[in-house]
Amino acid sequence: MESQQLSNYPHISHGSACASVTSKEVHTNQDPLDVSASKIQEYDKASTKANSQQTTTPASSAVPENPHHASPQPASVPPPQNGPYPQQCMMTQNQANPSGWSFYGHPSMIPYTPYQMSPMYFPPGPQSQFPQYPSSVGTPLSTPSPESGNTFTDSSSADSDMTSTKKYVRPPPMLTSPNDFPNWVKTYIKFLQNSNLGGIIPTVNGKPVRPITDDELTFLYNTFQIFAPSQFLPTWVKDILSVDYTDIMKILSKSIEKMQSDTQEANDIVTLANLQYNGSTPADAFETKVTNIIDRLNNNGIHINNKVACQLIMRGLSGEYKFLRYTRHRHLNMTVAELFLDIHAIYEEQQGSRNSKPNYRRNPSDEKNDSRSYTNTTKPKVIARNPQKTNNSKSKTARAHNVSTSNNSPSTDNDSISKSTTEPIQLNNKHDLHLGQKLTESTVNHTNHSDDELPGHLLLDSGASRTLIRSAHHIHSASSNPDINVVDAQKRNIPINAIGDLQFHFQDNTKTSIKVLHTPNIAYDLLSLNELAAVDITACFTKNVLERSDGTVLAPIVKYGDFYWVSKKYLLPSNISVPTINNVHTSESTRKYPYPFIHRMLAHANAQTIRYSLKNNTITYFNESDVDWSSAIDYQCPDCLIGKSTKHRHIKGSRLKYQNSYEPFQYLHTDIFGPVHNLPKSAPSYFISFTDETTKFRWVYPLHDRREDSILDVFTTILAFIKNQFQASVLVIQMDRGSEYTNRTLHKFLEKNGITPCYTTTADSRAHGVAERLNRTLLDDCRTQLQCSGLPNHLWFSAIEFSTIVRNSLASPKSKKSARQHAGLAGLDISTLLPFGQPVIVNDHNPNSKIHPRGIPGYALHPSRNSYGYIIYLPSLKKTVDTTNYVILQGKESRLDQFNYDALTFDEDLNRLTASYHSFIASNEIQESNDLNIESDHDFQSDIELHPEQPRNVLSKAVSPTDSTPPSTHTEDSKRVSKTNIRAPREVDPNISESNILPSKKRSSTPQISNIESTGSGGMHKLNVPLLAPMSQSNTHESSHASKSKDFRHSDSYSENETNHTNVPISSTGGTNNKTVPQISDQETEKRIIHRSPSIDASPPENNSSHNIVPIKTPTTVSEQNTEESIIADLPLPDLPPESPTEFPDPFKELPPINSRQTNSSLGGIGDSNAYTTINSKKRSLEDNETEIKVSRDTWNTKNMRSLEPPRSKKRIHLIAAVKAVKSIKPIRTTLRYDEAITYNKDIKEKEKYIEAYHKEVNQLLKMKTWDTDKYYDRKEIDPKRVINSMFIFNRKRDGTHKARFVARGDIQHPDTYDSGMQSNTVHHYALMTSLSLALDNNYYITQLDISSAYLYADIKEELYIRPPPHLGMNDKLIRLKKSLYGLKQSGANWYETIKSYLIKQCGMEEVRGWSCVFKNSQVTICLFVDDMILFSKDLNSNKRIIAKLKMQYDTKIINLGESDDEIQYDILGLEIKYQRGKYMKLGMENSLTEKIPKLNVPLNPNGRKLGAPGQPGLYINQQELELEEDDYKMKVHEMQKLIGLASYVGYKFRFDLLYYINTLAQHILFPSKQVLDMTYELIQFIWNTRDKQLIWHKSKPVKPTNKLVVISDASYGNQPYYKSQIGNIYLLNGKVIGGKSTKASLTCTSTTEAEIHAISESVPLLNNLSYLIQELDKKPITKGLLTDSKSTISIIISNNEEKFRNRFFGTKAMRLRDEVSGNHLHVCYIETKKNIADVMTKPLPIKTFKLLTNKWIH
């Protein structure tokens, strides 16, 4: 019997199988409460007899036979004897009898004396203590109550028995706790229903069906008082009774209301957890239903957030809606409303495909009605709690009492009071509850509890010889590590943590103690009946109590599910601390392996396959029970989600169904996959797979090409392998019709070997399903393995081979066996496997020297085919080796740095699993082996030396007063393996030779200098050089040694070519700042520098005056001092507080030379001549740090798990050379096609607007006679070169209007069809800004015009034809163009010539020379941008006259006449302008940016702290090797194009303060590394945060009527790649910033002065052109000024000495600058660096400095 019952429940873990021996009951579908009267009578007699025998004759005891169970036990058994409890005396599950009135007649069950009542309530006989039913009530159970919900169909015999014998019904249990009152009142109501008093029970509306009589009220009152003692009543019940102690009806009514509310909540939760939707009902109804449920739950205090609600809704979607699970599963912030928008879209698409009726949304009233109509359309599949019984004579089982006092314990004898519209769901276990659902009657299945545990109870077990418990809270006198061997029914060891005493305090106030074992590895807490019998305690299942031999009742027994339980409330808690026992060492052999670890170990196979494999022993070494499966259902492997993402499943059963049956290895499937691009030549590009039809055994072989001889070699190999290893001959090979299979060579080979080739039918790849599915599975595994391990892509075939080994060992759910078992091979020993990419250390048996490290970091790939070793990849050697000499490298950090979830580490599990294969390095000896020299065929990476030996440089401790970390060096001899880096390094393309990776040796003779620390914290690249060495306190004299005489401070004329050194500033967290560095002249610098070439003339020492003007001879009547003041006046320069002079300490007056070699692209101002951080500079202030965003940089740090190697020396490579096989980049499309805007547009309103715009465009085309409508041409008659494709494009303008445009495909236009010399001119942005500035100063009126369909006014000269759009139905016809259609190469130039001719001839305008599209006459100025015109004039009537002339020829619209004197708002060429004539003008783009930036999909942080500056000083763009797949590269380049394109548009329009950052990042569009993208995101975030900023202009108030044009220039020396300098200029007109420029110098400058000269020379041409434009538009005199903060540059401009120019390039630049300054009457002025607003154009600045320089003109 025991073995039979154990076999029925194999899934129960340790101890649970034993627990089912004596307490498990035969499975029945009958209600335990539903007991017929006849059986109660029989039971009463048998029970009375048994009780009387037990009372009078203790020496004998009999158990009545239970007619409900087929028990092999005899009806009577001997009484218990002294000593252990006999096994045959225990009540088995089949001997458990229902209990009746005699049970409740026991004195111990009625501790309270009944209240006095009428004698009619007492039955005959003085011993009865229970009330008798009044005669008016009738015989209990004789007729069912209509409200009870149960009907009984009794046989005639049953009727006679009921009428004659039944006098009592089963009463409710005693109320023992206020928390149990809700459950107790249900049983009490059931008791009243069974007593034919159901009519007096209040209904839902609070009123009974019939009035209650006095006798019934008395009966109600007394029974309530008996079974519900006052001390256990809830407070609200006591409050009712305090008012009227007889008002039991009110208590029942309120209880029913509470139960109804709880039932509704439970039903709502169950309905929400079991939603189903497939589109069969309207989406509106489904949405209304769900939202109503969520609203009700939220109103009742059960909050359902968006994430949980969306998961529940998506889980119930099926059919065409199922794909939403996959498209939406990564949207973490998705709302229910957004999800229903997608559901509505699919539903409307379905309806649209079924009929042509338009879809519409219903009004709210309709939705409410629908919610009632469709409430139960998705009713879950359930089993009703109390179905109606059809046969009352069937055997029933009595229900035991729930004596648990726990509020969370489920009630085992309560029924639902009323039914709800939604049936309760059946749960297999309590873990199926969702959303905090309580375990109520509506969720518990009382007929199947094989897996349920009754919380707070001990399970009675007669088969267990020892008591086992999981919690340590009740163990007394515990001792650890007991030497006890305990096994379960399957003979498996149960680990025991401790042994102690379990102490009981029973109802008779006696205390008893038994021995107990502590273990967490059991399903239930087991109470051994054998140990209870040893202390004279027996279990009486007749009365369901624990009692002593003298009959003393100790505790009730509760039957729950199939087992019997005793409450833990009788246990005495102990004072032992839980960690004392829980921390006891558990044997490693018994600890369960976590499922994620096994999932990764077995090549990321699914849980079902792994369980099948373990059950069938296809995977050996451990069993299914050794794995913790608790997380298998909900576990989501991110690597699987990424690596195995797919569009749809392959069609099942697509293989030929009627093929012949073959023996193993007679029928093979084969297919070739490839090629894999962008791999080194040594790596395979293809693989060929074979699958046996019968066993499903797989083989894979690498291929480098698909040539005939390569394929033939593989076929020869596998056929020989099958013949020798399996003694089988291949008969048929199925393959596709690729040329590699259909060639003559292979065909002859197959024919020679007697093999039949079976080819798939043409264009039917599905017929080749076996091979196709295998390739897909292997590729999914490959991507997942590479994603999880981080290994380089050229190891892809190793991942394929690892997956094949594991897949051959996993059991198939259909066959229940693995391919290895089918093939007759042993199962795979998992202890011989390592996770793919597992970091290991390989022993180097032949090191370079005796002191060289003996371990080489590597990554395990797969078991070797040719030995007992393992294939391991060694990144440092660029090869794979076959070896057994390795140890596993343990790491405690997250393996998956790309995901934001908990780290997974399995070091202990891996150690246990591979214990027999672990160590090869002993503490006293190292066993050397020659295995390392065995190179396998997996050596896919050629040997490239990327780590040349570098000289070691020792850094002095005095690097910086704030540096406390000692310097470190990285060399080849000091490599260390970081435990925090689990991922493998991404390798560079081995085909890139050393010559194009390493810097050219001819470029500089500077010795190589290794890094002193990695660039892990933000990309700072520090050099291993003695920046600051300790100096003597005394001043040293000048000597011939440069190392003792050079000053660390600024030297403008310092020559790198002659000294082989480069100035490098000291790094600081606060960026660069030179406010504490005193200015020194070139002469002073020259005195401190020895062995240098002759320099230029130096200026005399400068004073501390804020403005210094250099006198230049110019024909002006104004004094030079007044000219300087007039130029400086009104400029938006920052106001600086006075500063006290800073003195240098003596030790730093003389510093040694600084040697550096810097090639990084910088956002931090490397080598900046204008900003240095001195030795006594302070840290950045809180203002500088408060808005700094911490972004990850893909440099070598703890979060970058791509490398286990030390940081390499930075190597500059060409941007394009870093990307493999890069092709053309498609332009970004922002418009819609015809099918997108109209044909398949789901938005009905938008579609209608596009249709309206389409008809408007067609009418305009016909009106303008765009083509010849008189004749249509055949396509064959026209030269294809002259045929232009055409299409409609649609877009939505910023003002909300929808526009359609018919355009020609000019991108594919033949060059012979247009004149490449024609130009399409538009107004220059500087011209527009100049015109706007002059308009503000001169109180001009500004009028904005638009010419509709401007291009169509221009005739076309060439003979061109276009194809009509496809929807017009003229596919074979052509039409000849007559007008310049939009999109043609020549259309812009044709329109420009047309409008230019009209403005000059008809409007009396003339074009300003050198400034295209700027027209003027004596009164009006016009700026033309294609079809937009901006008119400026002092008299508004002048503008109106021009407008009238334009309307005579063109369809001209007045966008804004500009006649108001108040503030007027314009939208001119993307600029949002606020203009109040004579006062101010504000230029911004807030609305445009608010609309455009969110569409870029940039991770914005709108609620976080705002950035104070667009970038951080000291950050460098690390341009190491960039290895990306082509698709990934294109996607990132496209993203960079969009982001930098928008930033450039904003920067060159008005945000000139951003131009440096934009220009630097624009140089890296083709190098989209993670660091570049992070910096770009930071820039976009800053633009978003400051989108409301505006360029502010105020009307100037000059003393004299002159215009003042000023350029402020600056340069940062050598801070760009290849030592290029960054130059910047800002142009101001009358104190208003009208433009700016930031760019990298085209030539390499050799000093800061040369960089400043280059910057000034770049600004002068545009300054002269602007001067000419201003004089043409405004006839006032003009003063031109040039401001710089380089005094040495000023001295060069004014000097007449040409002897000291260091080279020809420098001299020619300087001489040209002198000529330009003198010839153009430029006033050159000095400006302090701290006031130089052009500083923002050349380097990133600290937040405080950035704000100081920009807040006067951008705010």
Swiss-Prot record:
Provide the binding site for Mg(2+) 1.
Answer: D671, D736
Biased-composition ranges, Low complexity, are 153-165, 402-418, 960-969
Motif (Bipartite nuclear localization signal) positions are 1178-1212
Region Disordered, residue ranges: 1-93, 126-173, 352-421, 956-1087, 1092-1111, 1130-1187
Binding positions for Mg(2+) 3 per the UniProt entry:
D1610, E1652, D1685
Question: What GO molecular function annotations does the UniProt record carry, in alphabetical order?
Answer: aspartic-type endopeptidase activity; ATP binding; DNA binding; DNA-directed DNA polymerase activity; RNA binding; RNA-directed DNA polymerase activity; RNA-DNA hybrid ribonuclease activity; zinc ion binding
Q: Which residues form the active site?
A: D461
For this UniProt entry, what is the primary localization, expressed as one broad class? cytoplasm
Write out the residues that bind Mg(2+) 2.
D1346, D1427, D1428
Annotated region RNA-binding: the residues are 299-401
Concerning PTM, the database record says:
Initially, virus-like particles (VLPs) are composed of the structural unprocessed proteins Gag and Gag-Pol, and also contain the host initiator methionine tRNA (tRNA(i)-Met) which serves as a primer for minus-strand DNA synthesis, and a dimer of genomic Ty RNA. Processing of the polyproteins occurs within the particle and proceeds by an ordered pathway, called maturation. First, the protease (PR) is released by autocatalytic cleavage of the Gag-Pol polyprotein yielding capsid protein p45 and a Pol-p154 precursor protein.
Q: Which residues form the Reverse transcriptase Ty1/copia-type domain?
A: 1338-1476
Q: Where is this region: Integrase-type zinc finger-like?
A: 583-640
Domain Integrase catalytic, first and last residues per copy: 660-835
Query: Where does it sit, as one GO cellular component term?
Result: cytoplasm
Give the catalysed reaction(s), semicolon-separated.
DNA(n) + a 2'-deoxyribonucleoside 5'-triphosphate = DNA(n+1) + diphosphate; Endonucleolytic cleavage to 5'-phosphomonoester
Skewed-composition ranges (Polar residues)? 1-10, 48-60, 127-152, 1005-1015, 1054-1082, 1101-1111
Q: Which GO terms describe its biological process?
A: DNA integration; DNA recombination; proteolysis; transposition; viral translational frameshifting
Entry domain remark: The C-terminal RNA-binding region of CA is sufficient for all its nucleocapsid-like chaperone activities.
According to the record's subunit comment, the protein's assembly and interactions are:
The capsid protein forms a homotrimer, from which the VLPs are assembled. The protease is a homodimer, whose active site consists of two apposed aspartic acid residues.
Name the chain's protein: Transposon Ty1-OR Gag-Pol polyprotein
Write down the species.
Answer: Saccharomyces cerevisiae (strain ATCC 204508 / S288c) (Baker's yeast)
Gene name, per UniProt, is TY1B-OR
